[in-house]
Structure formats: C-alpha cells, structure tokens
Amino acid sequence: QVLDYAILVINGADGVQGHTRTLWRLLKLYQVPVFLFINKMDQPGADKEALLWEIKEHLDSNCIDFTQERNEGFYEEAAMCEEAAMEKFLSEGSLASNDLAQMIAKRELFPCYFGSALKVQGVEELLDGLYEYSRTPKYPDKFGAKIFKIAREEQGNRLTYLKVTGGTLHVKDMLHGKAGEEEWAEKVNQLRIYSGEKYEAVSEAAAGTICAVTGLTKT
C-alpha cells in the first residue's frame, strides 16, 4: 500500500512459480504498477521466448518485452494494450515515452527486462527503463502519513514504519491521532532511513519518504 512501483524478479531458469503468482495477485489487489526483471538468463535452459509466453499466459497478456524497445513491432504491441494508445499509434505510427509511462502507471502495460544480475547483464537497461517510464507522484503540502508496520529493535525501541504522503516530517514534531475514542499526541524522537538492518538518522523526511519513527506508542 506504500509502493509507487514494484519490480517483480522472476528466475529465468524456473519461470513463473506459485509464489510469483501470489505476489502478482497482491500487486493487483493493491493496484501497484509493475516492472518485471527476468533474472538468471545466463543459465542453461533459460529460453526468452518461452518465458515471455509463460509470463503472458500466467500473469498478464500485457507484459511486453522492453528489451526490444523501438524495434519494429514494439509500439504496435504496446498500443494493443489500451484503446486510446492504439488510436494514437494508428494516427501517428508511434507512441511517446509519456504515453507508455501513463499506461504503466495505470497497470495497462507491464515492461519486461531480461538479464543476469550476477553478471550485471540487463540491469542497466532496467534502471534506464525505471528512469524513463516511472513518474513521481504529486504530494500535497499538508502533512500526511500512512503507517504500514510496527516493530521493535534489539534494544527494545518501538519502531513505527510509515510513508510520508504529504508535507515534511521533522524530528520533534508532534503527531496527532485517534485510538478508538481517545485522541493522542506524541513527539517524534528519531527518524530513521533503513537499508537492510542498517539505518541513517535524519532530521526530516519529505513526502514520498519511507522511514521508521521512534517515540510513538499509540500507533
């Protein structure tokens, strides 16, 4: 519920598995736009055409090979995913990057990239695609946040994980909420940006930032 986009990684040697379909259903449930990276294409038995057919068959027929971008037939195949895009393609013969970006954001199109993370093959193309076809949401100036996880670290500190959905959150800000009929107000002691188990303490978190907050007991 806090994701702007998701990257779904599929093992090219194994193809679409049960857990792949489970993740796909969850992403559909929460309407998260998806980029797909089919990994381990350097392994024996990894067949790109067969994998793409399997992905279209078991996930969505609008999963398109973006490694063939700008090749003959690419824009026509992409345009077939959405009626307005097809009308533009028929009149202009192509689609703009923004057209594709809008289709991806609306889950009408799912870009597929193929490669090997271990050998750093296809990774740059994926990153280029994310840069070109993802769009940063417009956030309001008024502060807002969505809490998605509560945890405790080894020292016992209670961590409230949230995404800032508007404005900016600062250390020492007072947050207000309601638990049942009881209204509460608590101070932000610390803001942490996590990367794995490590974190960086920051003084503020702008809209779009995912962070962990200490000092809250009522969330």
Protein language model annotation of sequence segments:
Residues Q1-T219:
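Structural and coupling elements of P-loop NTPases
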